[in-house]
Structure formats: structure tokens, C-alpha cells
């Protein structure tokens, strides 16, 4: 069982009330540029239930997003995967789930740069104006569409211009990715 706790910081927000537009338009930035130094191989490419770990994550993100967001006429999804050194091996997997792909040429600079690259790409290229962006890492094979749906729902239910939703899990409500 998972628990989603919504965090909202509106102290400096010009908006005092939640936006009344429903459904909200949510994009996804998938971080798949990790170097897997401790593991010694790319975790996202490991086998998982007949496919790869990355297939499981992409499937969960796609399923949870589809359950949460009303599709528009555009067939281009507001999804981007940010790759690193394994770009050529990861690209065919993520594109099969509707993700555009951009490569972080400097993955050693960390996730922050990959997030910035992904967010910039979505803001500049999304087929629809976005109200929020869900960021995920690509090595969580136990991620489910239901958890993704809960995170998006918590965001939608608590939306202000500076809403941040942090998923929590376990008895101690540890922060998740």
C-alpha cells in the first residue's frame, strides 16, 4: 500500500485559490541517464518479468498518466526521457512508450542537470501548455500505474502555482523518488 502526501507552498504564490481548469495538463520527465557505477551495469536494462526494468517503469508511467489525464487531440505525448552514456540502448525502449529522447552530454554532473534538460525540453516542445511535470527515475521496476495516478491526483487536488507532491511509503512514510 502506498501513501501520497501532498506538499503545497503558496506563501509567495500570486494565486490564492486552486486553478479551476480540469483536468490539468501534466508532462513527464524520465531520468534514464544514470551511470550505475555501484551496480557495474545499467540497471534499467536488466531483465524484469520478460522485458527490462525500464520497460516496467515506462509502462507504469504511461498507464498512470493515461488514467489521470484527459487526452487531447494531439497524438504527441508530453513525455521526455533524458539519457546519458547508454543513449543508443535506451532510446528504442523509451520511444516505444511515446517518450521523446534528449541526451545529457554530461551525465557525470548529476540528476539536477538531467532534470533541467528535461524540463526545458518539455516547456519548449510540449504539444499542450503544462500545469505540472512529474519527474521519475528509470530504475524502479516496482513502480505501478496506480502510484503514478495517485501522485498526479494529489497534485491535481492540491494544485496551486507552487505545488510540489512528494510520494511517501512504508510505516515511517519515507520519501520516495
Give names to the regions the model predicted.
Residues 1-24:
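Eukaryotic N-terminal low-complexity, Ser/Thr- and Lys/Arg-rich leader segments
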Residues 177:
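Conserved beta strand-loop-helix elements of the APE1-like EEP
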Residues 18-174:
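Nucleotide and nucleotide-moiety/phosphate-recognizing core
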Amino acid at each position: 500500500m502506498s501513501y501520497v502526501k501532498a506538499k503545497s507552498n503558496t506563501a509567495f504564490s500570486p494565486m490564492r485559490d486552486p486553478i479551476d481548469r480540469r483536468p490539468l495538463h501534466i508532462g513527464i520527465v524520465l531520468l534514464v541517464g544514470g551511470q550505475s557505477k555501484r551496480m557495474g551495469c545499467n540497471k534499467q536494462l536488466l531483465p524484469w518479468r520478460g522485458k527490462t526494468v525500464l520497460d516496467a517503469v515506462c509502462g507504469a508511467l504511461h498507464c498512470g498518466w493515461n488514467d489521470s489525464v484527459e487526452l487531447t487531440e494531439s497524438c504527441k505525448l508530453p513525455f521526455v526521457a533524458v539519457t546519458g552514456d547508454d543513449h543508443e540502448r535506451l532510446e528504442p525502449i523509451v520511444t516505444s512508450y511515446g517518450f521523446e529522447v534528449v541526451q545529457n552530454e554530461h551525465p557525470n554532473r548529476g540528476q539536477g542537470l538531467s532534470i533541467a534538460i528535461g524540463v526545458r525540453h518539455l516547456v519548449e516542445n510540449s504539444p499542450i501548455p503544462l500545469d505540472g511535470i512529474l519527474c521519475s527515475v528509470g530504475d524502479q521496476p516496482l513502480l505501478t500505474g496506480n502510484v503514478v495516478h495517485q501522485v498526479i491526483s494529489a497534485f491535481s487536488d492540491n494544485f496551486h502555482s507552487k505545488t510540489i507532491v512528494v510520494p511517501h511509503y512504508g510505516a515511517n512514510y519515507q520519501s520516495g523518488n
